Amino acid sequence: MAGHSKWANIKRHKWAQDAKRSKIFTKHIREITVAARLGGPDPEMNARLRLALDRAFAVNLPKDRADAAIKKGAGLEEAEAYEEIRYEGYGPGGSAIMVDCMTDNRNRTVSEVRHAFSKHGGKMGTDNSVAYLFQERGVLVFAPGTDSDQVLEVALEAGADDLVENDDGSLEVLTTPEAYRGVRDALTEAGLEPEQADVTQRPDLTVQIEGDNAVSTARLIERLEDLDDVQHVYTNADLPAEAYEEG
């Protein structure tokens, strides 16, 4: 199966995350706390907590801070009560955008998200206005030049659904959320280490956005990601790499 270029956007995203490490740590700690509260403190028995820890350690969150977040979530220490909310909307040029938040103040969060959409030429939608365009999938991305035959063989044997070969030569292994952990472990054990791996909301189809709309969409995504209450931003926009460098 063929797909669009992902590599430049992934590298850009990793650079942006590194540049905001302190805020990123706070968001990961919040995710760990909520996961432990909802499913218990044992990552072997709590898939959401295990994924939250994977994400946190991928950006080098210290283990002692992760352990403290688990204790808070499990009720062993006092913790804030966060509510999970999803907002949906449209970017400039008509791309779909979903914004997952954790907040202790719903009014503040919706105001900030709405302002970001409005400022950058987008608009808020209603519940389920764009969610149907995405599926929750495990996605493991490999750099251009990775042996696609080997990745395909190991991934399918471990329970993956598909291998996407992107225009730039990068590879995406797709799994169900349930199969994600086993597929990732099998690939790693075979010496195939993904550059990026996560359970995410993957669009069924992407929308190519160009020119000024692409720059505005990139600014919108970056602004949403920078909001304190926002945990994840998903879009079906296929943006050129230079969109993140302009504006």
Curated annotation (Swiss-Prot):
Example GO molecular function: DNA binding
Keywords: Cytoplasm, DNA-binding, Transcription, Transcription regulation
Gene Ontology terms: biological process: regulation of DNA-templated transcription
GO cellular component: cytosol
Subcellular location: Cytoplasm
InterPro entries: Integrase-like_N, TACO1_YebC-like_2nd/3rd_dom, TACO1_YebC_N, Transcrip_reg_TACO1-like, Transcrip_reg_TACO1-like_dom3, YebC-like
Keyword Transcription regulation recorded: yes
Keyword tRNA-binding listed: no
Family: Belongs to the TACO1 family.
NCBIfam families per UniProt: PRK00110.1 (NF001030), PRK12378.1 (NF009044), YebC/PmpR family DNA-binding transcriptional regulator (TIGR01033)
Protein name: Probable transcriptional regulatory protein Hhal_2210
Organism listed in the record: Halorhodospira halophila (strain DSM 244 / SL1)
